[in-house]
Structure formats: C-alpha cells, structure tokens
From Swiss-Prot:
It is a multi-pass membrane protein. It comes from Saccharomyces cerevisiae (strain ATCC 204508 / S288c). Residues 1-16, 70-94, 138-144, 210-218, 276-282, 326-353 are cytoplasmic. The chain crosses the membrane at residues 17-37, 52-69, 95-115, 117-137, 145-165, 189-209, 219-239, 255-275, 283-303, 305-325. The lineage of its organism: Eukaryota, Fungi, Dikarya, Ascomycota, Saccharomycotina. It comes from the Eukaryota. This is Probable transport protein YPL264C.
C-alpha cells in the first residue's frame, strides 16, 4: 500500500479526527503540568498553586498567544480581534460554555476522586451525539451509537469506579484520605451536579463550534474561550475570600505555567479545526484518547504501570476508535467531507506562516 493511497483512503477522509487526536495530546500535556503544580512532592503544602489560579494563568497566556497569532496572520484572519459580527454572540456563548466545562471538572476534583471526576466527563460524547442529532440534524448510525457504548465500557474498565467494582483496600488509610474523596453525601451530590453541568458545557461547545463552522476563523473560538475563562477566573480569585493571588516562586513553576499556556493554545486551535471538519458525534469519540495519553504519562513520568483491567480498557478503546474511523459513512457525508476539505481556508500550514 503506497503512501499516496494511504493518504487518499485514510488520512484525508479522517483529517478532522487526526487533528482531534493530536489536540488531545497537548491537552494531556496540560494535565501533567497541572498535576505537578498541584502535587509536587518537592514543594511544601503552602506552595501549592490553586486550580482556579492555574486556569487563570493558563488562559491568560493562551489569550496572548491568540492575539499574537491574529496580528501575525492578519491577512488571513478577518475581523480582528472580535470576529464577524453575526458570529459574535455565538462566540461569546462558546466561551461561556467552555468555562462551565472546565469549571465543572476543577470543582468536582475538590470533592470527588480523580477517577470518578474523569468518568463523569466521559459522558460528554454520548450527550454530544444526541445533541448534534437534535439541534444540528446530523445523522448517526446505530453502529456509531454502539461504538460510543463500547468506548465507554473501556473507560469504565480503566477508571474502575467504586460503585461498580466495590472498595479496593490498599493497606491502612491515613486521615488525609478524605481529601481525595469526601465522605459527606451533600458535598458529593453538589460536586456531581456541578460536574454534570460541566458535561453539558463540553457537549455544548462541540455543537456551537460545529454550528459556527467556517463562518468564523478557528482562532476566534480559542480567543473567546480563553478571554472569558480568564475574566471569570480572575474574578473568582479576587472575590472569593478563601483565595489569594500566588505567583510562581521557581523557574520550574514558571516553565510549567508556560507549558500550560502554549499547550492550551495549540490544543484549542487543533480542537476547533478538527471539530469544524468532522461530524460532532463521530469527532466527540476521540475524547477517549485522553485515557490512553493519561496511562502513557503515568508510565513515562511516574513509573506507574497499568494493571490488567487498564490494559483491557485500552484495548477496547483503541479497537472501538479504529472501528469508528473505518466505518463507511453514507455517500452524502463523504461528498460533504470532500467539499469541506477543499474549501477550507484554515489549514495546518497556516500555523507555520
């Protein structure tokens, strides 16, 4: 099989999916930086950076990157810096929904274990499929619905929530275990509710970006999201009494913050480009690759090897993802994808200009 045939049969028809897969790699890089900033064993507990403040720094750097990019490519980016007038209300809504998506995850982590919090966010692809069908009129086959369920089952094998697999005893517990997951039913209920609100926000972002399509440059979506999140996070840090502004105090922390901003910028650019080129339901399934990236970083950085359940879950996710990619869309959808690829004004090459 020649490279030309591979490009014609696999790369071009799945160009949007490839962009999404790469974008989630940069998202995983942000997660690693956040984890080190919050849980660095070399730092004292007083030196830990608040998650909302991490979000503030990350999004402010990302917004600065969007401004530099727009002015650097002013010939190909129209209506700088606010985008086309008819799309501005949708871009603002995209920023608001994007903030709810991020806030839901960060808030739930205060009271839920990481596994439970992540598991809830993976309800987003299924919700997106139904929203895209209801609001955008996009078709989705029974096989795609089955593929989403299979992928979700793989996530369950990796996350292994306690309400399905039971309590897993790992020696004597310390008094600080309540920090990992609260035992207060009311706090858990609030955390789950806010997390579900975040899921709705994530799914809404897919729908809004897909609705905007190519009517606005992809950088505008990133710009509005980062600006809205920066403003809201700054207000939270300034107005919430229990929070105070804490600057990084080492070159390592500054480097991690810089990686947060740059990776966030690249992630949002590729994510928007991928969503614009792929149906919302099929594209949202690529979020499951984040689980694979998480395992990769665990092994490389923290020397934590997956157990048998994790390997089984990875196999299920990879298999179902490949299955979805190779599913033949209807003749109508293939023509639409070809037209979208041929008329798009925003390509990866633009990032190199």
């Amino acid at each position: 099989m020649t490279l030309q045939r591979i490009s014609k049969d696999y790369l071009k028809p799945n160009y949007g999916l490839i962009l999404l897969i790469v974008s989630y790699f940069f998202n995983s890089s942000m997660v690693v930086s956040t984890k080190v900033l919050e849980n660095d064993p070399l730092e004292t507990s007083q030196s830990r950076i608040n998650p909302l403040q991490i979000l503030l720094v990350r999004m402010s750097i990302t917004y600065c990157c969007t401004l530099v990019y727009m002015h650097w490519n002013k010939q190909s980016v129209p209506d700088i810096p606010w985008g086309p007038a008819p799309c501005r209300k949708w871009l603002i809504l995209r920023g608001i929904m994007g903030f709810f998506g991020v806030f839901g995850m960060y808030f739930s982590l205060m009271y839920l274990s990481i596994s439970d919090a992540v598991l809830i966010t993976f309800m987003s692809p299924t919700l997106t499929i139904f929203l895209s069908f209801l609001l955008l009129g996009e078709p989705f086959s029974k096989l795609e619905a089955l593929g989403s369920l299979i992928s979700f089952s793989g996530v369950v094998l990796i996350i292994r929530p306690t309400f399905l697999f039971g309590e897993q005893t790992q020696g004597q517990q310390s008094p600080q275990d309540d920090i990992v997951e609260t035992q207060n039913p009311k706090l858990r209920l609030i955390a789950i509710g806010v997390s579900l609100l975040g899921v709705c926000g994530l799914s809404s972002v897919y729908i809004i970006i897909r609705y905007i399509g190519n009517k606005a440059h992809a950088i505008m979506s990133v710009s509005y999201f980062s600006l809205v999140t920066t403003v809201v996070a700054a207000l939270g840090v300034l107005l919430i009494p229990s929070m105070s502004l804490q600057l990084p105090h080492s070159w390592k922390q500054w480097g991690l913050f810089l990686n947060l901003g740059i990776s966030g910028f690249i992630h949002q650019i590729l994510l928007t480009m991928g969503i614009q080129r792929e149906r919302a339901g099929r594209g949202s399934l690529m979020t499951y690759t984040q689980v694979i990236y998480a395992v990769f970083w665990d092994v490389v950085l923290f020397h934590h090897w997956p157990n048998i359940w994790t390997w089984c879950g990875m196999a299920v996710i990879v298999s179902s993802t490949i299955w979805v990619i190779n599913m033949r869309a209807s003749k109508q959808n293939v023509v639409a994808t070809a037209e979208l690829l041929s008329t798009s004004d925003f390509e990866l090459d633009d990032l190199e200009d």
